[in-house]
């Protein structure tokens, strides 16, 4: 189907960031925020050439005059017109390729609604005229990127987290657990607890500043109670951060209280089990014979697993839940922020994968529902 000289494109559409590039590369060429910004006010200056919408980094840099909207909520696309804008921007501005010349591998959230997969397929073939495409589940790609075909992936991005047990390359749908708690909720929580300290962050632009604070200064405590005592009795855990306007803020126990929410969702009023329990529950829904393989291959993936200390804490918490003799191994690859994309890059460049693409011809014969037959 595909000639060897045409490289496939790999696009991982996350709730927070789009990662895009060419199959066979070891990292994405383009990484930009999944946002579309629209001007808050009608332009007054004539001839300024103000656009009616801005995408990605350009929207980010003009955030002072725009209203920013993330169009992928909890991993699921909610606004297809904006999604088309983002894909258009990816092809033409970021990768500078003609979409009709390259097969495209897209990623989707586990348990993505069927209608959504069909819509993605339809847009690729009808709007962008792709010669071929494929839709792969994000967590499965992360597992491939870690060099495994069996394991449980805890994938946590900006909009949603999932625990996905995978056996011999196939996700086990009955055991997948979705947790609507991820990076964006942590950012919102950090905004809230910084307000208690007397700093106010309210606008969409200020939220981006707080996200940066979170990424640079937060970490997961090995023992939360102990860490709280340390923070209360000394200032050794305090760090300062300079805001864009030059004002300096100091942040103390917020540094680990923010990501602790992943383990204690009650912090933000969610009645859900923490990520350690969710992993355990997911494993317990699987056949008793494969649990040992899952415990020993627990792979972290996604930007919200980048907090220092998260792997040690998960190891400790899951060990407390699992049978005492069980060997537990948490794998936290350094490039896990992009492991979904890297897995896609690996998959799309395998010679054995080339017969898996959905071709334009197959799409024309069967319509969008072909995606359920070819991608699973």
UniProtKB/Swiss-Prot annotation:
The keyword Cytoplasm applies. Its EC number is 3.6.4.-. GO terms for molecular function: ATP binding; hydrolase activity. Keywords: Acetylation, ATP-binding, Cytoplasm, Cytoskeleton, Hydrolase, Nucleotide-binding. Residues 1-2 form a propeptide. Pfam families: Actin (PF00022). It is an enzyme of class 3 (hydrolase). It comes from the Eukaryota. InterPro entries: Actin (IPR004000), Actin/actin-like_CS (IPR020902), Actin_CS (IPR004001), ATPase_NBD (IPR043129). It catalyses: ATP + H2O = ADP + phosphate + H(+). Its main location: cytoplasm. Embryo. Predominantly expressed in the aboral ectoderm cells. The modification N-acetylaspartate is found at residue 3. It is found in: Cytoplasm; Cytoplasm, Cytoskeleton. One of its GO terms (cellular component) is cytoplasm. Signal peptide: none annotated. SMART domains: ACTIN. Actins are highly conserved proteins that are involved in various types of cell motility and are ubiquitously expressed in all eukaryotic cells. Belongs to the actin family. This is Actin, cytoskeletal 2. It comes from Lytechinus pictus.
